[in-house]
Each structure stands twice: as structure tokens, then as C-alpha cells.
A protein has these predicted regions:
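C-terminal amphipathic helix plus adjacent low-complexity
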Residues: 1, 196, 337-389
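Membrane-proximal basic amphipathic "stem/tether" segments
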Residues: 1-38
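Active-site and donor-binding regions of nucleotide-sugar-utilizing enzymes
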Residues: 30-194
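Conserved catalytic-core segment of nucleotide-activated headgroup transferases in glycan assembly
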Residues: 42-58, 172, 186-263, 334, ...
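Short acidic-hydrophobic, aromatic-tinged amphipathic segments that line or gate anion-handling sites
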Residues: 83-88, 269-274, 329-343
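Donor nucleotide-activated moiety binding/catalytic core segment of transferases
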Residues: 85-100, 255-297
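A donor-sugar binding/catalytic signature common to diverse glycosyltransferases
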Residues: 102-124, 129-131, 275-319
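Catalytic binding pocket for nucleotide-activated donors in carbohydrate/polymer assembly enzymes
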Residues: 294-363
Length: 389
């Protein structure tokens, strides 16, 4: 019933917003949205990296508007020439339907009657092709799939991280038939190029982590059952610190999750769920522990140790499922804490690099380190350089 209501809601809004089609499209106007979970939108993700790139390369050339949940959070960014509008307001509808180019990173606004002269770019929000998305899960119904089809019909350009994403996600799950730009994810450019020093320094400064202390990032994905499968980090730290190394644990909950880090000792850990940029956390992490999250794709380009902690593998497989069998992912699968400790203890950097390189090849990686440049060239060409009025 919930999916049916969303479907009917999508149709109704398409009709209600039609009067905005009388407004003139502004060639210099760009609109960005960054999905952060549920109805939340922030200055984040691939759209943020593209927006920042444009601001740096061509300052003042475009009028850039961001649709966000809370515009008051971005006063400093407004001083740099960006505009922030509260999402899902009449004012936001006006800017969305008068921009020449719209950039989003999710199944955005199927109920928007975007116009043929507008150019909608979807960068998506996850690299690779791992867990199944909502409209492609075993229990997905026709209404959920229909909303995804509405989204696909709005899109003029998909930005892809790899060939597997083309086939499994965009063509199959979304039934998207349009153009795909095979350039990698904009947010991964600096990771692919290995330019992580500044981001790592920023994270350490934010959480006051000693320069000599190494960082373990724990970033699980969302669980439909709401369960928390956090491993015992007290035991893990003993394994990690046996060679006189000091480790600090950062906990990053999924945007849909209600988990918290209250069980972690505050002297050697921090909850970084509200930190605005996941890529900067990855850049700072010396080790990643996750489960089924697509952050393994982004992190893999750093060739650092990563482990999949999956005590609920059978349940997750039945409820959500995968596009690529988890056995073909490049990192060790750990079903319990003992297996996790053993995998960490026996880590081999050479084998890790070989497994990652093989995985990139099998997935057909498009990551180039120049995605921002390539996508922004398309934005420039489809806005100011083309007549849209």
C-alpha cells in the first residue's frame, strides 16, 4: 500500500507542477541535490564535488543553487557565491524547473515534470554494483518499479563507475535507455589520484587524533531488520596494537540507520556519522571494516586493508541480495569476530593489491581520476553553450 501511495503521489505532483513550465529556463542556472537518506538532502556526494569543481574552474560563470533540507547550515558557502534553498518548497520547485542543468545522485523526484529542454544528470551515490537497490530487491512490487521508471525517464545522462553498474543497475534495475558517461565517480577523483593528505589531516584535526595514531573506520550499511552487528573493537584493538601501534576507531552509521556508537570507549573512538564527507573519512582511514556497503569500491582505489564483517550474510542475502556474488568481492569475508581477528592478523598487502586489481578489471572500472572534468564539460556544453531559451 505504501508503494502504491508513493506512485499515486508521483502522478499527482506531476500534474500540480505543470504551471511552472510557463517559466523561462535560465541557461546560466544550475541546480544540485545531494541525497543523504530518506527525505534528507545536503551539500554532499558526487554533486558537491562537481559543484566545487565548477566554482573553482569557472568562478562566477554560473548561478548555482542547492536544494537542501536545512539552508541555515551553509552560511559560509553562501559567502562563496552558492545559493541554498529549502528542499520541497514552492521556491525550490521554481528553481528546479527553470535551471538548464540539474545534477542529482539518486532516484530523484519522479513526480517532477522536468522539461525537454532541461538536462538532468544522475551521478548515482554508490560505486560498483554490489547490494541490490530498492526497486530490484526480491520483494519489490510494481509500484516501486514504476517510480524507478519515472526517474529513468527524467534522466538525460547517467555517470557510471564501471561496466557492471551499466549492466546491473542502470540498464537492468532502472530500465534506463539513455546515454551513460563512463568516467568514474567525481567524488573518487582525489582518491584515485592518491591525493589524500589534506583530507586526512582535516579529519584528524576535527577529532583531535594524534598524528602517530592509526585510524580504523567502521562503516556498515543499512539493515532492514534494524539490528546492530558491531564487532568487539576492544578485542580488535589488541590484535592491531600488538606491534606497539596505536589505533583510533571511527564509527560511521548508514544514513538510514538508527544505530549509535554509545558502546565504544570515548578515549579511543568517535562517532563520525554526522561528518559531512564520507570520502574524507576514507582518505583518513588506514583500515576499513564494513559489510555490504558500496564504500568498498571507493576505498579499493587506496589499496589499503579492508575486511567484510558479515555475521548476518544469509539473512541479508535473502532480504536484499547482490548483483555480484560476495565471494567475488576483493576483500576477506568474516562471518564472526574470530574470523575477523584472524583475517586482520594474517593480512598480506601484496595479495590485497592483486585481489583489488583483479576486481577492478572484472567489474570494468571507469575510474580515471578526471570524472569532475569530464562531467563539468558536459554541464558547460548543455547550459551556457547551448540555446535553451
Amino acid at each position: 500500500m505504501k508503494s502504491l501511495l508513493k506512485y499515486l503521489y508521483s502522478i499527482a505532483f506531476r500534474v500540480l507542477l505543470l504551471p511552472f513550465s510557463l517559466c523561462k529556463i535560465r541557461r546560466e542556472r544550475l541546480v544540485f541535490t545531494g541525497l543523504t537518506g530518506g527525505s534528507g538532502y545536503d551539500y554532499s556526494g558526487n554533486p558537491r564535488y562537481l559543484s566545487d569543481f565548477i566554482q573553482k574552474q569557472e568562478p562566477g560563470k554560473f548561478d548555482i543553487y542547492w536544494m537542501v533540507t536545512d539552508p541555515s547550515r551553509y552560511r559560509s558557502e553562501e559567502k562563496q557565491g552558492l545559493h541554498f534553498v529549502k528542499h520541497f518548497t514552492v521556491r525550490s520547485f521554481y528553481y528546479l524547473l527553470t535551471a538548464s542543468v540539474i545534477v542529482t545522485n539518486g532516484s530523484y523526484a519522479p513526480w517532477f515534470p522536468f522539461r525537454k529542454r532541461q538536462y538532468l544528470i544522475n551521478t548515482w551515490h554508490g560505486g560498483g554494483a554490489y547490494k541490490r537497490i530498492e526497486n530490484d530487491k526480491p520483494d519489490a512490487n510494481w509500484a516501486t518499479r514504476k517510480r524507478a521508471q519515472f526517474c529513468a525517464e527524467n534522466i538525460q545522462l547517467m555517470v557510471s563507475s564501471c561496466q557492471a553498474a551499466n549492466e546491473k543497475l542502470f540498464r537492468h534495475a532502472f530500465l534506463y535507455e539513455g546515454e551513460i558517461l563512463e568516467c568514474g565517480m567525481p567524488r573518487n577523483d582525489f582518491l584515485v589520484r592518491g591525493e589524500t593528505v589534506d583530507a586526512a589531516r582535516k579529519v584528524r584535526s576535527t577529532y583531535q587524533i594524534d598524528p602517530g595514531c592509526r585510524i580504523l573506520l567502521y562503516a556498515p550499511t543499512y539493515r532492514p531488520d534494524g539490528e546492530n552487528y558491531m564487532p568487539d573493537f576492544t578485542g580488535l584493538r589488541k590484535i592491531l596494537e600488538k606491534n606497539d601501534e596505536k589505533w583510533y576507531v571511527l564509527y560511521r552509521a548508514h544514513r538510514y540507520s538508527e544505530d549509535d556508537a554509545s558502546a565504544l570507549e570515548k578515549t579511543w573512538s568517535a562517532d563520525v556519522t554526522d561528518y559531512p564527507d564520507m570520502q574524507e573519512l576514507l582518505a583518513a582511514a588506514d583500515m576499513l571494516i564494513t559489510d555490504y556497503s558500496s564504500c568498498i569500491w571507493d576505498y579499493s582505489f587506496l589499496y589499503r586493508p579492508c575486511f567484510l564483517y558479515t555475521p548476518d550474510l544469509e539473512q541479508y542475502l535473502a532480504k536484499t541480495g547482490f548483483y555480484i556474488p560476495i565471494q567475488e568481492w576483493p576483500f576477506p569475508i568474516c562471518r564472526n569476530e574470530q574470523e575477523l581477528e584472524d583475517a586482520i592478523d594474517s593480512y598480506d598487502a601484496g595479495q590485497n593489491r592483486k585481489a583489488i586489481q583483479k576486481h577492478h578489471q572484472k567489474m570494468g572500472s571507469f575510474e580515471s581520476g578526471h570524472a569532475c572534468e569530464k562531467v563539468c564539460e558536459r554541464i558547460r556544453r548543455k547550459s551556457i553553450c547551448e540555446e535553451n531559451t
